[in-house]
Regions:
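Alpha-helical membrane-protein architecture signal
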Residues: 30, 34-38, 49, 257-267, ...
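Small-residue transmembrane helix packing/gating motifs
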Residues: 83-84, 197-240, 249, 255-258
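Juxtamembrane segments of multi-pass membrane proteins
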Residues: 7-165, 173-175, 183
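Interfacial "coupling" helices/loops that link adjacent transmembrane helices in transporter permeases
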Residues: 286-334
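Hydrophobic positions within alpha-helical transmembrane segments of bacterial inner-membrane proteins
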Residues: 8, 12-13, 55, 59, ...
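Peri-transmembrane interface segments
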Residues: 248-284
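Short helix-loop junctions at transmembrane helix boundaries
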Residues: 1, 321, 335-373, 383-396
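Cytoplasmic membrane-interface segments at the C-terminal ends of transmembrane helices
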Residues: 8-42, 294-310, 380-399
Length: 401
């Protein structure tokens, strides 16, 4: 908030050099008409900044969301590529996961070597509510776990923890930990391994036996089912058989790793589309602001426009001046908004790094599209004020009637 307020206060000072630099490039092909447009755009820096601020704020938010969405998709792709070794992944809606019957059916398909079922686990550790994962079956060959200490094999009371979590709590292999459940029971577990931080899994992972103990039957669910094919099995045939086995469970999807990444990215895109739709209102408000400011500017400069018309300026030239002024104002707001959006996006990515976001990814294609779109918006916003300016009657304007 402080940075936004600071930008609003600094915008008048920024508008003169930024708009001047833009004008030197954009208006050059238009000769004297272009010079007039550039001069008019920097004549009142406060008005220029105020006009561009709504567009600046809207595009800043769009850029922040775009950076977060692009980074999230890239992070998901990286996590799946480095953490999942399964041939196929069975998934379902987030609200219900994969039905248990579908898991059993998939395990019985010919050509399936082994499976690993991931479950969410919610327990209380030392008075704090914690979230982790449970796995039925060995993660070997299905999930990439880089062990720092101990083993990835989870026995009946096995409990593997991430390196960061182990260091924070002082846990090592052999440490006994107590899980307090929602039913009021206490379940003792023993740390059997410490693995390199893996956001795909979380802070810790327990065996399926412990999952059964700490999770009431009514809340149990399968998040994902990882399937590894028997060596030599035709993967296309296996996929067909898996789809046939899980067909009675309509919500189940059978995907390979690439398809799974695509589906996760599509969910992110859907969320972004909703947010972009809401932010479109800010752009509409910005356009109205530009129209209003240009209209007021035309009224204030009525005598000036009349004088220009009297000495020979044609109506198309008058309209062109207004178009260029609006274009410069819109681009000023867009450029500052995009720069701020990238800066804010970087800050959010750094803050959320522990939640699994990796290296920041900027959607440059989207950024270029926004700048070009802002230029178009600027010209469209100037249509009515430009027509009004061009209709100015020279003699009446000079006489200020």
């Amino acid at each position: 908030v402080a940075l936004i307020v600071a930008t609003a206060l600094a915008a008048p000072s920024l508008s003169r050099p930024v708009v001047g630099a833009l004008g030197a490039v954009i208006t050059r092909p238009f000769g004297a008409i272009g010079r007039l447009a550039r001069t008019n755009s920097v004549r009142n820096p406060r008005r220029t900044a105020a006009t561009a601020f709504a567009l600046m704020l809207g595009l800043m938010l769009v850029t922040v969301i775009g950076v977060l969405g692009s980074t999230a998709k890239a992070s998901v792709d990286s996590l799946v590529d480095t953490g999942v070794e399964a041939d196929y992944i069975l998934s379902g809606p987030q609200s219900i996961g994969v039905p248990t019957g579908a898991t059993t059916a998939a395990q019985q398909v010919a050509g399936v070597d082994r499976t690993a079922v991931l479950h969410p686990v919610f327990v209380t550790i030392a008075g704090q509510e914690e979230y982790g994962a449970a796995i039925d079956g060995s993660p070997e060959g299905l999930l990439e776990l880089s062990m720092v200490q101990g083993t990835a094999d989870l026995d009946s009371d096995g409990f593997s923890v991430s390196e960061t979590e182990a260091a924070a709590r002082g846990w090592t292999v052999g440490t006994e930990v107590t899980f307090d459940t929602v039913d009021g029971a206490s379940v003792p577990v023993t740390v059997t391994g410490v693995f390199t931080d893996n956001p795909l899994i979380g802070n810790w992972i327990v065996s399926g036996d412990i999952y059964q103990e700490v999770t009431p039957s009514i809340t149990r669910s399968d998040i994902l089912v990882l399937v590894k094919a028997t060596p030599g099995t035709d993967l296309d045939t296996l996929r067909t058989d898996l789809e046939a086995a899980t067909k009675p469970f309509v919500v189940v999807q059978v995907q390979d790793v690439e398809e799974f990444k695509g589906s996760q990215g599509q969910q992110i895109d859907t969320l972004l589309a909703v947010l972009y739709g809401l932010l479109a209102l800010a752009v509409v408000i910005a356009v109205l602001g530009i129209v209003n400011t240009l209209a007021l500017s035309v009224v204030e400069r009525r005598r000036e426009i009349g004088m220009l018309r009297a000495i020979g300026m044609q109506r198309p030239q008058v309209r062109r001046i207004i178009y260029l002024e609006s274009l410069l104002i819109a681009l000023f707001g867009a450029i500052v908004g995009v720069v701020l959006g990238i800066a804010f996006g970087w800050g959010f990515v750094q803050t959320l790094r522990d939640e699994g976001l990796g290296t920041m990814t900027v959607p440059w294609g989207q950024v270029v599209s926004m700048l070009l779109g802002s230029a178009v918006v600027g010209v469209l916003a100037a249509l009515w004020p430009a027509v009004r300016a061009a209709r100015t009657k020279p003699l009446e304007a000079i006489a200020d009637l």
